[in-house]
């Protein structure tokens, strides 16, 4: 891998803020997804981790631990209709909550009030917005060797993936402190040494089994960072960063277009949204609230 040019080095500071690591592009670049296994057929281990390479992929290679090099952390609001099996509204991908989360219906946050407004509402009023979800999206490079149900092995080395964090994988409640926290931020992002970016380090990811109030089991990702070994910025990583930027810019350009159409009173293009979401796998499991 070659070293970066001076121009590319100078671009990194701006990219750090744009990618949430401290846009015009094509939405047709679809990243494989890192997922948690909830299927125990054929002797599969619940809670194991695998990569779904595309929407038609069924030959998965499972492991208990992966090494992940984070590149981007973004947030997105959405409304998912289980009956229609599609996303009916979604916001721009935002790197923090100071950004305006314009959405495809011409509102902000798919109509969800601000956190402050939600806290001040009575419980019955908050429930009206329960279908509006906030998803944390991590993009980066994963490395691991896994086995499929036939016992065959496959090695992924610095393989670009998307991780969707919903429900308890996005936010949890610290009952002792009576505070909400984000596991990825608490276990990794807030510990990144000053002056570094999230992509300067690897983090080992495992899963932990938990139970909700209804005694239903689910799994959360657990993060163990490796801050002893700072990773260099090289050409291959820079190219991946630019690809991710293109994905984010393309998504946001699309949402912005729908936002301004809605403001002008033009018909919301639900079919176009459905077509776009067909490029991703079905989101019924991704948007299920496991809390």
Residue ranges and their predicted role:
Residues 15-18, 180-183, 187, 275:
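Charge-rich, solvent-exposed alpha-helical interaction surfaces
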Residues 90, 95-101, 110-111, 216-291:
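Long, highly charged low-complexity segments enriched in Glu/Asp and Lys/Arg with interspersed Ser/Thr
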Residues 2-160, 216-218, 278, 282-291:
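OB-fold ssDNA-binding interfaces and closely related basic DNA-contact patches used
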Residues 137-230:
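Extended serine/threonine-enriched, polar tracts that run as long, contiguous segments within proteins
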């Amino acid at each position: 891998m070659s070293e970066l040019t001076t121009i590319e080095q100078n671009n990194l500071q701006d990219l750090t803020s744009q990618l949430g690591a401290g846009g015009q592009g094509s939405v047709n670049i679809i990243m494989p997804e890192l997922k948690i296994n909830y299927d125990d057929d054929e002797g599969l281990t619940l809670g194991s981790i695998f990569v779904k390479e595309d929407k038609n992929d069924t030959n998965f290679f499972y492991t208990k631990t992966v090494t992940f090099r984070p590149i981007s952390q973004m947030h997105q609001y959405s409304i998912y209709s289980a009956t229609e099996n599609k996303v009916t509204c979604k916001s721009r991908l935002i790197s923090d909550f100071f950004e305006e989360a314009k959405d495809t219906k011409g509102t902000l946050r798919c109509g969800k009030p601000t956190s402050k407004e939600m806290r001040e509402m009575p419980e019955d009023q908050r429930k009206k917005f329960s279908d509006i979800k906030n998803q944390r999206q991590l993009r980066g490079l994963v490395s691991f060797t896994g086995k499929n149900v036939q016992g065959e092995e496959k090695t992924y080395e610095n393989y670009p993936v998307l991780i969707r964090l919903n429900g308890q994988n996005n936010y949890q409640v610290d009952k002792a402190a009576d505070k909400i926290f984000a596991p990825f931020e608490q276990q990794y992002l807030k510990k990144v040494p000053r002056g570094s970016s999230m992509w300067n380090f690897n983090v080992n990811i495992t899963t932990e089994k938990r139970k909700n109030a209804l005694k239903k089991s689910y799994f959360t990702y657990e993060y163990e960072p490796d801050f002893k070994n700072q990773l260099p910025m090289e050409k291959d990583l820079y190219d991946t960063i630019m690809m991710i930027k293109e994905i984010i810019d393309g998504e946001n350009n699309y949402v912005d277009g729908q936002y301004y159409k809605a403001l002008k009173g033009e018909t919301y293009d639900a079919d176009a949204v459905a077509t776009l979401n067909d490029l991703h796998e079905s989101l019924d499991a991704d948007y299920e609230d496991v809390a």
